């Protein structure tokens, strides 16, 4: 009986492993309605896309079927090989979209700039047997590309989707998964991987993440904390002057880290010609300028008893709070552009909410202390005045 139970358990585990493995290989289980067969397939990492292909090294022919699933109406799709680079410019694309009359149009379009309109033209290599089907929200592009084996059999690939205006493709989104849809494909081994650029093989996505983390931590978290320190710790006489040095340290550190993040953003902008995030960029420049003015204005800070100190305080508080508001807005704008997993936005939102609650509680406590201290000082002054007059309060 025990042997039978163990055998059943082993059989169940075996079936589970086989089933899990089969489910994990999404593209290998797909059956084309045209009964076409391909030797290899890759589950592309973004945009719900899959590439099925067969490569004949003797003829240099690459037979492909590019599938784009979960496609909403009014969308175009494209798959491309870039023989000269790793991005969009220089890509030799195959485009397809459903037309208003119900037919599907498939054609070739070389990409020469980021302002492309996806106009039809011949590619730098021969393409034959080009066709496409669209049903059940899935577009499939079929083609044979003549690609003589080069660079060890590794090719750079790009795939995209975007909206249509009538029968005209509109520019695709320039954030989220639409800027991650690049990969390399080894036609010999079948291996695929992310495309790397820049020194040390750091990808643009990694640089975007570094840019986001540096700016989120500095402008978006440390700056508000520094303001909270200055606003609420100085109410305690025992914290003077420690609160000031802590405030300066926090804000200075935030500024230094923020400048590093800002410089990373400038570098990303230079490496991504044609991709513009105008609002995000403008707010970032405004942040840098205001924060820099704030730093250098510290050298012009009048002494507490100086007659112009009140005006300096008004300026300092106005610029400081403006920086914090712009920083939080721009961090959320950056999250919209980067489109990370939802947990990152939730985490930053939670941090801002907690800081907001802390500020509200401390604001109430500060006013309580200030009012109580004011009453005590007023009472002390009254007692002193009465004492000086030689009269009792009880007379």
Curated annotation (Swiss-Prot):
Residues 47-162 form the DOMON domain. It is a multi-pass membrane protein. It comes from the Eukaryota. Residues 176-371 form the Cytochrome b561 domain. The keyword Iron applies. Residues 1-24 form the signal peptide. Pfam families: Cytochrom_B561 (PF03188), DUF568 (PF04526). The keyword Electron transport applies. One of its GO terms (cellular component) is membrane. Its cofactor is heme b. Disulfide bonds: none annotated. Heme b 2 binds at residues 247, 316. This is Cytochrome b561 and DOMON domain-containing protein At5g47530.
